[in-house]
Swiss-Prot record:
The record marks D60 as: Reversibly protonated during proton transport. InterPro entries: ATP_synth_csu_bac/chlpt, ATP_synth_F0_csu, ATP_synth_F0_csu_DDCD_BS, ATP_synth_F0_csu_sf, ATPase_proteolipid_c-like_dom, F/V-ATP_Csub_sf. F-type ATPases have 2 components, F(1) - the catalytic core - and F(0) - the membrane proton channel. F(1) has five subunits: alpha(3), beta(3), gamma(1), delta(1), epsilon(1). F(0) has three main subunits: a(1), b(2) and c(10-14). The alpha and beta chains form an alternating ring which encloses part of the gamma chain. F(1) is attached to F(0) by a central stalk formed by the gamma and epsilon chains, while a peripheral stalk is formed by the delta and b chains. This is ATP synthase subunit c. It is found in: Cell inner membrane. It comes from the Bacteria. F(1)F(0) ATP synthase produces ATP from ADP in the presence of a proton or sodium gradient. F-type ATPases consist of two structural domains, F(1) containing the extramembraneous catalytic core and F(0) containing the membrane proton channel, linked together by a central stalk and a peripheral stalk. During catalysis, ATP synthesis in the catalytic domain of F(1) is coupled via a rotary mechanism of the central stalk subunits to proton translocation. Belongs to the ATPase C chain family.
């Protein structure tokens, strides 16, 4: 039982860490490409900025889903019920 809970805690840490790392890399690439595009064509900067914010909002949903899965494993672990039952 303790082994299962410790593996679940490790899994939660990996899920949260990789979700955060992936989002950080995505935001870095998105911001870099936005600045590159705005430097090439300054008249397109407002339109690119709107699209960047839309994509940033969608990109921010990825770690939120990861946090929900991590909270599920933390507080309502489905594997503990199978082990006890």
């Amino acid at each position: 039982m303790e082994t299962l809970l410790s593996f679940s805690a490790i899994a939660v840490g990996i899920i949260v860490g990789l979700a955060s790392l992936g989002t950080a890399i995505g935001f870095a690439l998105l911001g870099g490409k936005f600045l590159e595009g705005a430097a090439r064509q300054p008249e397109m900067a407002p339109m690119l900025q709107v699209k960047m914010f839309i994509i940033a909002g969608l990109l921010d949903a990825v770690p939120m889903i990861g946090i929900v899965i991590a909270l599920l494993f933390t507080f309502a672990n489905p594997f503990v019920g199978q082990l006890a039952g």
